[in-house]
Amino acid sequence: MENPELEKLQYPIGKYTAPDEYSAEFIKGAIYQIATFPERLKQEVIYLNEEQLDTPYRKEGWTIRQVIHHCGDSHMNCYIRLKWALTEEIPIIKYYYEDRWSRLEDNLTMPITPSLLLLEGLHYRLAYLMSSLNANDLKKSFIHPEHNKEIQIKELIGLYAWHSNHHLAHITELKKRKGW
């Protein structure tokens, strides 16, 4: 049985729901969300102190620090997957264990500035490349080995726009609950 309170903390903007159609307008909006994520994230976290950064967004959840570093880790994987899909014929991508990565020392204790800077450059490149894609490029794909599922680039764009906003909401909702 699901716990609605826990689900609201885990998925503050809801679980990802793919659109019925990946229209040009949807893709443009998703790329805009990706392009603006680093600045929106920075505005929410830049003035937090160490204790706040080390506060989990929910019981047994990641800390704000871990969420920020996870976004860097995850979105680097997105960038590589995008490049593979554009340059190879339906490649099988490498799966990574995000929970294990989140427990590495850099994700646990490193200052957030390097990841904020990484996200700034990475998202510029993501948005730049994504904006250059034509309809045929958006249909190119890769295989994700976790569920042996083929994922098209247009789906990747929608998913990572959601992923950015999903983790940003973890932070903004925690700040609201704590009155920060």
Positions of PLM-derived features:
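Short, contiguous alpha-helical
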Residues: 1-13, 17, 54-100, 139-180
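Small-residue-biased structural context
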Residues: 2-6, 24, 33, 47, ...
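Short, contiguous, helix-prone interaction/anchoring segments in small proteins
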Residues: 22-58
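Acidic/His metal-coordination segments adjacent to aromatic residues that form catalytic metal sites
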Residues: 23, 101-114, 146-155
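A generic "alpha-helical surface" signal
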Residues: 28, 32-35, 65, 69, ...
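Acidic/histidine-rich alpha-helical segments that form the ligand environment
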Residues: 32-39, 44, 102-139
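A short secondary-structure junction motif
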Residues: 44, 48-51, 89, 133-136, ...
